[in-house]
């Protein structure tokens, strides 16, 4: 749908009476005299995200949620004990589309969904109805990218459809052992039902081989990269290493233990003994889970540096493109990856890469010795050695940057579309066989 963008601002909010608002950070409290009427919650762009309504006794009774384009998307009604009783999702014109009711039971709360005057006892049932509606006419292909919202339903359709199971992460619980018994729990049900899918798609050739080795090559397995580099990127003039921040490295990822940023810092501490002006910029929101383990490890690693200011933690950013253009080397030291689009994007802008040998994306995206280096899975010393090797030889660094630009053609729109073509050909064969 082509929906006009008309964001709701605080001055557009109408409580039906004249109100006075008092600012409290991203919250604006609405009053009529001394009577508290409601709370307006803004996004970081000063757009209305939701409006909370309160009764004369200070009890929350309704919340209205708004899309960033300016229309209301969801209404919620609350019980006197501050529990959601009813939720209604709206279309762009404000018409109710889906209603969800919560009914207290002895064991908790029961959910009831209503759509098109039909009642469903669970979200799974509602999704099955939705997919059946999509599948009513013609021959259809469904791609499951999020298994928990579709895997069971797409095997229960009233009319056959061509169903593709898409793996966008590691299938096993251990990235170093694809045959380990314990599977990635996000995919477990789908993996136990491998014979029911018409096609299985993974993002790298190695993962496709591992899938066939474990579940049998009788399955129709295809390799399609997760990421695509827009054609316009290949028309941009390359940025030479000499025009970038000197001796600069970059990592953009969720700051979590499994991303190994502490190991990058430890490697940097070693490398700076040879090249003292090396720097590392880290971007990503901090995962404070597991008793803040990620930051504890990072803070310990920072103590190994001769100068802690060599590492800067910037927090999350939405605009990573300029960072890829201003830095020279991109770092990965992860425990598990499914592809790593950020690495692909950095390479498309000429960044040289250093990664540990982690499946599945980085050890496919990085061609060792051409556009970067791959070191052992846990080898911090080797990681540091490659930092020194790259930044000790400007000519090599530039050559690898040139290669990074060239090898990014593997993920152009044209090349990725070619990877999809065998799947569509198999879909056509499925249609003919069914006729």
Short names for language-model regions:
Residues 188, 193-221:
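A short, active-site helix/loop in glycosyltransferases that binds the activated sugar's phosphate group
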Residues 413-435:
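C-terminal alpha-helical cap of glycosyltransferases
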């Amino acid at each position: 749908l082509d929906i006009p963008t008309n964001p709701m601002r605080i001055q557009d909010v109408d409580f039906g009476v004249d109100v006075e608002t008092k600012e409290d950070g991203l919250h604006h409290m609405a009053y009529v005299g001394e009577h508290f009427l409601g709370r307006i919650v803004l996004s970081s762009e000063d757009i209305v995200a939701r409006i909370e309504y309160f009764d004369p006794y200070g009890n929350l009774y309704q919340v209205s949620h708004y899309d960033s384009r300016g229309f209301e998307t969801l209404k919620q009604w609350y019980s006197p004990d501050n529990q959601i009783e009813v939720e209604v999702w709206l279309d762009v014109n404000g018409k109710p589309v889906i209603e969800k009711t919560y009914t207290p039971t002895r064991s908790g709360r029961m959910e009831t969904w209503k759509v098109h005057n039909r009642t469903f006892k669970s979200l799974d049932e509602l999704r099955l109805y939705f997919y059946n509606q999509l599948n009513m006419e013609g021959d259809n292909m469904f791609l499951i990218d999020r298994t928990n919202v579709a895997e069971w339903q797409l095997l229960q359709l009233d009319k056959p459809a061509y169903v593709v199971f898409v793996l966008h992460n590691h299938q096993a619980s251990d990235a170093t052992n694809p045959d380990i018994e314990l599977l990635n729990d996000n995919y477990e049900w789908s993996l136990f039902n491998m014979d029911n899918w018409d096609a299985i798609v993974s993002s790298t050739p190695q993962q496709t081989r591992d899938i066939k080795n474990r579940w049998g090559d009788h399955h129709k397995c295809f390799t399609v990269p997760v990421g695509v580099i827009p054609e316009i990127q290949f028309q941009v003039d390359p940025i030479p290493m000499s025009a970038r921040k000197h001796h600069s490295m970059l990592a953009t990822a969720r700051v979590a233990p499994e991303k190994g940023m502490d190991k990058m810092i430890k490697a940097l501490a070693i490398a700076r003994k040879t090249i003292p002006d090396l720097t590392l910029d880290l971007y990503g929101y901090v995962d404070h889970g597991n008793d803040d383990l990620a930051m504890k490890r990072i803070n310990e690693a920072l103590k190994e540096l001769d100068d802690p200011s060599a590492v800067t933690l910037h927090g999350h950013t939405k605009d990573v493109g300029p960072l890829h253009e201003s830095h020279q080397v991109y770092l990965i030291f992860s425990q598990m990856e499914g592809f790593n689009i950020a690495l692909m994007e950095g390479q498309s802008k000429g960044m040289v890469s250093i990664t540990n040998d982690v499946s599945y994306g980085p050890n496919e995206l990085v061609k060792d010795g051409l556009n970067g280096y791959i070191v052992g899975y846990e080898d911090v010393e080797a990681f540091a050695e490659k930092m020194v090797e790259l930044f000790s030889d400007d000519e090599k660094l530039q050559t690898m940057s040139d290669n990074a630009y060239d090898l990014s053609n593997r993920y152009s729109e044209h090349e990725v579309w070619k990877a999809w073509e065998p799947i569509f050909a198999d879909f056509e064969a499925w249609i003919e066989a069914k006729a």
